[in-house]
């Protein structure tokens, strides 16, 4: 594992005395302060990269949390004001008012935080409202370039909730929405659908337009959807392969953002992020690096050492001979070798 996901209720101290008392007893003035301390401790003690989903945030909160978390997120769910009316799913949830969530997306862009967001389908919204929600995300992303992932999440009815008997969206609605998201955001945006919410139809979901399964943990349940267990990674790999794609790991911060580290990652996290990525911004598969005499090189490197390339261009051969002789290589020569 390379990520520690923090997902929590939004500022419970504003509503519940028990939350205020618990925070005060631990010495924190707010849940945001507590979250900062917890994420900082996890990062320093384990080296895992925190990804935070704490709800709506003010600009100063985002700026502070960004120093302990390379990425954050909040689901927009929908821009439909209609869903906030009495008798509708978002009634009585002021944190889900569309303007409030859109402002958090805007704040994240201003703060330069790589951000995950998305929509929830099957809660009474229309197809038009889904498109409007995706376009609202796109508008903010075009201003700031910070949205690294769009989640298309299908509603699942849960026990002990007011919507326990609400109908769930069918596969056709999910596939339609994924396809529309891909059209609206183009080929470069990462689009995700949670695999544990659609078992048995994963190849169809891939074909609809996703390129990411989101976080799939081998050690914890999905705490947001505990009734829906994660697929085993081996099974997910087979399902992905059956759709003609290759399953590979990524960090919580996407490759393009990790590579542009000066813009998107807080300086306190630079060293760790760089340690974890290869030249393409993907997670490294081993701890070895050139010049490390204490760690066994990976199989690919050992194979190249044991069975070296027999035909080298003259300039590469000359650079290698210089290196063997102890000559300090120029930057251009090092680039040529790679």
Regions found by a protein language model. Give the residues of each.
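Auxiliary Fe-S-binding modules of radical SAM enzymes
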Residues: 44-46, 131-338
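Conserved Radical SAM active-site core
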Residues: 1-145, 311, 334-336
